[in-house]
UniProtKB/Swiss-Prot annotation:
Subcellular location: Mitochondrion inner membrane
The family this protein is said to belong to: Belongs to the COA3 family.
Alphabetically ordered keywords of this record: Membrane, Mitochondrion, Mitochondrion inner membrane, Transmembrane, Transmembrane helix
Organism: Saccharomyces cerevisiae (strain ATCC 204508 / S288c) (Baker's yeast)
UniProt keyword Transmembrane, yes or no: yes
A Gene Ontology term for the protein's cellular component: mitochondrion
InterPro entries: Coa3 (IPR041752)
Role of this protein: Required for assembly of cytochrome c oxidase (complex IV). With COX14, negatively regulates COX1 translation and is involved in MSS51 association with newly synthesized COX1.
Listed name of the protein: Cytochrome c oxidase assembly factor 3, mitochondrial
Amino acid sequence: MVLNPSKYQDTRTWKMTPAMIRARKPFFKGNMLGLTLLLGVTGSVYYYTYHFLHKDNDFADVPIPPIDPQELEALKKEYEAKKKA
């Protein structure tokens, strides 16, 4: 498939013509502002999500009641019995 030459591109080098560059010039700042805003919002969402999900949440503030050694042995035996079955 052969590309049809555009009147806004030089047919030999495929670069934009000066007319096309002049036509795009007024929109450059707005486009860059929009791009910056879009990337900023996207980056902020990813940053917030990453740091929110990677918090150290190891339940350190939950007190663990002490366990009696006899209860611990009974629980170990129960665990081993379930493991074998």
